[in-house]
UniProtKB/Swiss-Prot annotation:
Its EC number is 1.1.99.1, 1.2.1.8. Keywords: FAD, Flavoprotein, NAD, Oxidoreductase. Belongs to the GMC oxidoreductase family. InterPro entries: BetA (IPR011533), FAD/NAD-bd_sf (IPR036188), GMC_OxRdtase (IPR012132), GMC_OxRdtase_N (IPR000172), GMC_OxRtase_C (IPR007867). PANTHER family: CHOLINE DEHYDROGENASE, MITOCHONDRIAL, GLUCOSE-METHANOL-CHOLINE GMC OXIDOREDUCTASE. This is Oxygen-dependent choline dehydrogenase. Pathway: Amine and polyamine biosynthesis; betaine biosynthesis via choline pathway; betaine aldehyde from choline (cytochrome c reductase route): step 1/1. The active site is at residue 465. GO terms for molecular function: betaine-aldehyde dehydrogenase (NAD+) activity; choline dehydrogenase activity; flavin adenine dinucleotide binding. Involved in the biosynthesis of the osmoprotectant glycine betaine. Catalyzes the oxidation of choline to betaine aldehyde and betaine aldehyde to glycine betaine at the same rate. It comes from the Bacteria.
């Protein structure tokens, strides 16, 4: 079996590339996916978002090694093992990232990936329902909507931010990210709008696109040229050959693993596992980054939260309405208000993100408070901690060793203390007076730096945004894995295009920029002239040097 292009992974970037590479009908594309079909309400119902990430049917089941700086806790790292990849198990929050994120990419060696370069690709992929005119795309495959914000708590959160002196923004994906405002969702007609729904399924209707179910074991190389992929399907091993290129889009965990299994990575590490060296790229598996967050929870004195919907009868009613009409509480992820703010004067653009939720519960649906409540998920966006993904053995079936080194930099602790205290300030504003009860978590007794640090150590959680393990950069950067056209340095006919190529994590959730990578990489692969650069200038707070708000 062979095709012009062989893509490993049907996730956010892989699906976008399958769509774009096959669009003109000239080239054939094979997408290799080990995961299951994305069918059923557990995947497609937005409110069921906590289920698939806890199920081995849909998730690769990765976890970090015990993390020494958070008390030896091992944090789960869900990655989608399903059509659509992690876009089929994520929280459906859509964030492009801040313009300065991409300018930093370009300045660090990923030339051609500045905000002016990537903004046209965000517009090309979007079908925005209500975003800022002129800044948003309206004809792309990816539907993006705002929640209805029927619950008054969503408006209280935005008003509280305004009362605390922060900016308000109507579209954090438009000209102005900084501020409090509505959250955007990848939901369409009451269903999760994953990369599979947006890109892969339309692509599979074309005669030149084929989906192959199989476990990718390694890249097949002839000398220093990639010519195919060895896959395992059942008990059968076979090679799918690429006439033009192999493109890895297997996630920030599996992409570096696959490179190393194929002889591309740190020479000493590969030798340790008896793998023949093809290209010594010490950056493979390094530069691992993520977002961490804590949940600040408050009792609600009025019975208006989702706590009323957590009983079995209400869940059944919500499920039936969604199955019949795709409406009601099942048709939203319930993240409908958000904020991006700066932690202190001298910070040019937001470095703290908020997700607001009208219920007090863990992201994975566990440990719900036994009362009406609301919560903010809050965390710093630019941690200085860095981790790694390395091989456990040369066996492709073994999960890799994942070490995030969470909270290993002292600045992370100061940033999180500020996040906790800032959230208390926001919840203490007059807008919450009609609703505010006692603090559930951390609890009023947690006040000193040491007490807050203990709370963080015990309760900090991943936001599930791993990236950076196949860093994009200049060809003379020894830690770069791919060049600015996503080509693996030192190997021909092989590219990586997914969140693993991010030089630095972006300001927000990663599904949006991952799809953008797939869109832009497609033009590089096809040899097209990139879309014309934008001349639109993003809003930067004129007081950023003297004030945090």
């Amino acid at each position: 079996m062979e095709a012009d292009f062989v893509i490993i992974g049907s996730g956010s970037a892989g699906s976008a590339m399958a769509y774009r590479l096959s669009e003109n009908g000239r080239y054939s594309v094979i997408v290799i996916e080990y995961g299951v079909p994305d069918v059923g309400p557990l995947i497609q119902m937005p409110a069921a978002l906590s289920f698939p990430m806890n199920m081995e049917t849909y998730d690769w089941g990765f976890s970090s090694e015990p993390e020494p700086h958070i008390g030896g806790r091992s944090l789960v790292t869900p990655r989608g093992k399903v059509l659509g990849g992690s876009s089929s198990i994520n929280g459906m929050v859509y964030v492009r990232g801040h313009a300065c994120d991409f300018d930093h990419w370009s300045q660090s060696g990923a030339r051609g990936w500045a905000y002016a370069d990537v903004l046209p690709y965000f517009k090309r992929m979007e079908n925005s329902q209500g975003g800022q005119e002129g800044w948003r795309g309206t004809n792309g495959p990816l539907y993006v909507q705002r929640g209805k914000r029927d619950n008054p708590l969503f408006h209280a959160f935005v008003e509280a931010g305004h009362q605390a002196g922060f900016e308000v923004t109507d579209d954090y994906n438009g000209e102005k990210q900084e501020g409090f405002g509505p959250m955007e969702q990848t939901i369409h007609n009451g269903r999760r709008w994953s990369a599979a729904n947006a890109y892969l399924k339309p692509a599979l209707k074309r005669p030149n696109v084929k989906l192959v179910k199989g476990f990718a074991r390694k890249i097949v190389l002839e000398g220093k040229r990639a010519v195919g992929v060895e896959i395992e399907a059942g008990r059968t091993f076979s090679t799918i050959r690429a006439r033009r290129e192999v493109i890895i889009a297997a996630s920030s965990i599996n992409s570096p693993k696959l490179l190393m299994l194929s002889g591309i990575g740190p020479a000493a590490h590969l030798k340790e596992h008896g793998i023949d060296l093809v290209a010594d790229r010490p950056g493979v598996g390094q530069n691992l980054q993520d977002h961490l967050e804590v949940y600040i929870q408050q009792e609600c004195t009025q019975p208006i939260t989702l706590y009323s919907e957590l009983n079995l009868f209400s869940k059944a009613r919500i499920g039936v309405e969604w199955l019949l009409f795709k409406t009601g509480d099942g048709a939203t992820n319930h993240f409908e208000s958000a904020a991006f703010v700066r932690s202190k004067a001298g910070v040019e653009y937001p470095d703290i993100q908020y997700h607001f939720l009208p219920v007090a519960i863990r992201y994975d649906g566990k440990a719900a408070a036994q009362s009406h409540g609301f919560q903010a998920h809050v965390g710093p966006m630019r941690s200085k901690s860095r981790g790694s993904v390395t091989l456990r053995s040369a066996n492709p079936r073994e999960k890799p060793v994942i070490k995030f080194n969470y909270m290993s930099h002292e600045d992370d602790w100061a940033d999180f203390r500020h996040c906790v205290r800032l959230t208390r300030e926001i919840f203490g504003q007059a807008a919450f007076d009609p609703y505010r009860g006692a603090e559930i978590q951390p609890g009023a007794h947690v006040q000193t730096d040491d007490e807050i640090d203990n709370f963080i150590r015990e309760h900090v959680e991943s936001a599930f945004h791993p990236c950076g393990t196949c860093k994009m950069g200049a060809v003379d950067d020894p830690m770069a894995v791919v060049d600015p056209e996503c080509r693996v340095i030192g190997v021909e006919g092989l590219r990586v295009a997914d969140s693993s190529i991010f030089p630095r994590i972006t300001n927000g959730n990663l599904n949006g920029p991952s799809i953008m990578v797939g869109e832009k990489a497609s033009d590089h692969i096809l040899g097209r002239t990139p879309l014309a650069r934008s001349n639109q200038e993003p809003w930067i707070n004129p007081r950023w040097q003297v004030s945090d708000r």
